Design a protein with these regions (language model features):
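An N-terminal structural lobe/cap that precedes and organizes the functional/catalytic core
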Residues: 1-111, 200, 204-244
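Amphipathic alpha-helical interaction surfaces
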Residues: 77, 81, 127-130, 195
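Active-site-proximal alpha-helical scaffolds that flank and shape metal-associated catalytic sites
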Residues: 84, 93-165
């Protein structure tokens, strides 16, 4: 699951992100995004639910919101990756991508198929409600990056100083808008390939992306079937109160 799919339900909840008493709302969105942000800057930095739960009783509501967002992220990923639609689409994409990718040069069609389902789902959700991305970035713009980084360093065993500069760059680049167009999507995908050390994807993929996009749009409801489910907050709150 990618950024907007993680955030969508919370953006649509009146007063959750904006409005009276919602000052911590953007920090929940930051928590929901954090595991994906960390995959960009340093995969050795991990924010696990068990560690985040220890902060649920913190006196700072922003810290609590980030911790809740981290737990929500991992909960969402678990149900999402178990949906029939994700399993079928990612597997089919992996098979079809083999005719475009150079396996002998190290290309990994399974990895590409996996992330394509997630990015194209974000594109589908954006097309449904174009203002959602505007709301998302507006909420992110309210963050204190130092506060978010401090939470990461309390949760992760590996410290980092890279979260603080990443957040304004993430807001400035607004790359989630690029998923709507196949050429821009391919360009963004090749940024990912470079970052993880995989071969660049060929331009011939532009001939295949429209059918992939159409199938993800068709599977949208199944892919989002668990979107209204919540983590077992009582369980995680107990972890907070029993932690030293």
């Amino acid at each position: 699951m990618n950024y907007l799919a993680h955030a969508r339900r919370h953006l649509l909840t009146p007063g959750k992100i904006t409005g009276p008493g919602a000052e911590a709302g953007p920090y929940f969105l930051a928590g929901v995004a954090l595991p994906d942000w960390l995959s960009i800057i340093d995969r050795k930095v991990r924010t696990r639910s068990e560690s985040a739960a220890k902060l649920l009783s913190d006196s700072d509501p922003r810290v609590v919101a980030v911790a809740r967002g981290i737990i929500q992220h991992h909960f969402d990923d678990r149900w999402f990756h178990q949906t029939e639609e994700f399993l079928v689409l990612s597997s089919r994409f992996a098979v079809e991508l083999r005719q475009y990718l150079d396996i002998e040069q190290g290309a990994q069609p399974g990895f590409v198929g996996h992330i394509l389902v997630e990015l194209l789902l974000d594109a589908t959700l954006t097309a449904e409600q174009p203002d959602l991305l505007d709301q998302y970035y507006a909420a992110m713009d309210l963050l204190d990056p130092e506060c978010v980084e401090n939470v990461v360093n309390r949760v992760s065993k590996t410290p980092t100083s890279l979260v603080r500069p990443l957040i304004p760059r993430f807001i400035r680049e607004r790359f989630l808008y690029d998923y709507a167009e196949d050429a821009k999507l391919l360009w963004r995908l090749n940024h990912v390939m470079k970052r993880v050390g995989l071969p660049q994807l060929p331009e011939s993929l532009l001939n295949w992306l429209p059918t992939a996009r159409e199938r993800v749009t068709h599977a949208r409801d199944g892919l989002m079937s668990g979107q209204h489910e919540d983590p077992p907050w009582d369980h995680w709150s107990n972890q907070s109160t029993t932690s030293p």
